[in-house]
């Protein structure tokens, strides 16, 4: 390869590394906004063309607003949630599309209302599709397959000393 | 340095970044296949020269098949497992060898059989050696030192609503 071609190849590969990092940060922002219940900011992580399937594909949505409205209604302030993403496997499929696998651990705690003291723990394998529009990466598709999910009653004597949603 | 030398240095450094990312993805695939009980796919992450020590080095294996057979037998369908890897420290030792440290959190749930309702939680520091063969990274050595491990009886009233292994 000529020097010119080698520099061009470097530029392309460095762009891919930057895209992988940007996608990891996009997902970090998604989890942070989800558990921080920052719905408007969460919407900015979703592609206008989003197709989302939740709960093993039973629930499907077709716009950022539909997704955030669903999340907002299904994760009210009475519910503390933690979605912890691990060991991503990101593949750049083209200059504007990518695929990502994430190992998810999740934890839900109901602090009030009908489900007070209910706890839910689980794990899942996420598979996402991402799309780059005008230099910015967005979540285009997200869905997961549960490893397991368990529901239980928490000991009421557990004292929640801090809760950002109350 | 000449332009040629500068391009060469860039190529070398970018290759190291790509190798670090590839190793992180390799480990993500290993954990995903382990907990998804996808033994054939797990085998593809292991080097033909693998030397593995589990349980603080007491168990040692010398081929991918030996490792996956052991894992398959010791982690049957009655056992939900979650191995969550955190904060990797990857060092590229040479063009074809690397070392990786991982902070592991693990959770095991026995859903049936002799150990029904047993739970095991723990944490460990993993130290791995990786090997690159024909451009592909593999786990060459993996072993860990336990931070702690705890065994307990889970409340039978905990309701497992989803389990990919059942």
Curated annotation (Swiss-Prot), chains A, B:
GO BP field: bile acid biosynthetic process; bile acid catabolic process; lipid catabolic process
The reaction(s) this protein catalyses: 7alpha,12alpha-dihydroxy-3-oxochol-4-en-24-oyl-CoA = 12alpha-hydroxy-3-oxochola-4,6-dien-24-oyl-CoA + H2O; 7alpha-hydroxy-3-oxochol-4-en-24-oyl-CoA = 3-oxochol-4,6-dien-24-oyl-CoA + H2O; 7alpha,12alpha-dihydroxy-3-oxochol-4-en-24-oate = 12alpha-hydroxy-3-oxochola-4,6-dien-24-oate + H2O; 7alpha-hydroxy-3-oxochol-4-en-24-oate = 3-oxochola-4,6-dien-24-oate + H2O
GO cellular component: cytoplasm
Enzyme Commission code(s) on record: 4.2.1.106
Organism: Clostridium scindens (strain JCM 10418 / VPI 12708)
Gene: baiE
Pathway stated in the Swiss-Prot or TrEMBL entry: Lipid metabolism; bile acid biosynthesis
Assigned keywords, A-Z: Bile acid catabolism, Lipid degradation, Lipid metabolism, Lyase, Steroid metabolism
Protein name (record): Bile acid 7alpha-dehydratase
GO molecular function, one term: bile-acid 7alpha-dehydratase activity
Enzyme class name: lyase
Chain's role: Functions in the bile acid 7alpha-dehydroxylation pathway, which forms secondary bile acids via the 7alpha-dehydroxylation of primary bile acids, and is carried out by intestinal anaerobic bacteria. Catalyzes the dehydration step in this pathway, yielding a 3-oxo-Delta(4,6)-bile acid-CoA intermediate.
Description of what induces expression: Induced by bile acids such as cholate.
Quaternary context: Homodimer.
Pfam family, any one: SnoaL_4
InterPro entries, alphabetized: NTF2-like_dom_sf, SnoaL-like
């Amino acid at each position: 390869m000529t020097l010119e071609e080698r520099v061009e190849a470097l530029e392309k590969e460095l762009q891919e590394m930057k895209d992988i990092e940007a996608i990891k940060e996009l997902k970090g922002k998604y989890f942070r906004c989800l558990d921080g219940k920052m719905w408007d900011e969460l919407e900015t992580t979703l592609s206008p063309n989003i197709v989302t399937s939740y709960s093993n594909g039973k629930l499907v949505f077709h716009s950022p607003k539909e997704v955030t409205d669903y999340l907002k209604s299904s994760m009210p302030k009475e519910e503390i949630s933690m979605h912890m993403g691990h060991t991503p496997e990101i593949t750049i499929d083209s200059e504007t599309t990518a695929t990502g696998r994430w190992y998810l651990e999740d934890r839900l705690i109901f602090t009030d209302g009908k489900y007070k003291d209910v706890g839910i723990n689980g794990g899942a394998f996420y598979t996402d599709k991402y799309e780059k529009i005008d230099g910015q990466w967005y979540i285009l598709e997200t869905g997961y397959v549960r490893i397991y999910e368990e529901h239980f009653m928490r000991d009421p004597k557990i004292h929640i000393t801090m809760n950002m949603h109350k």
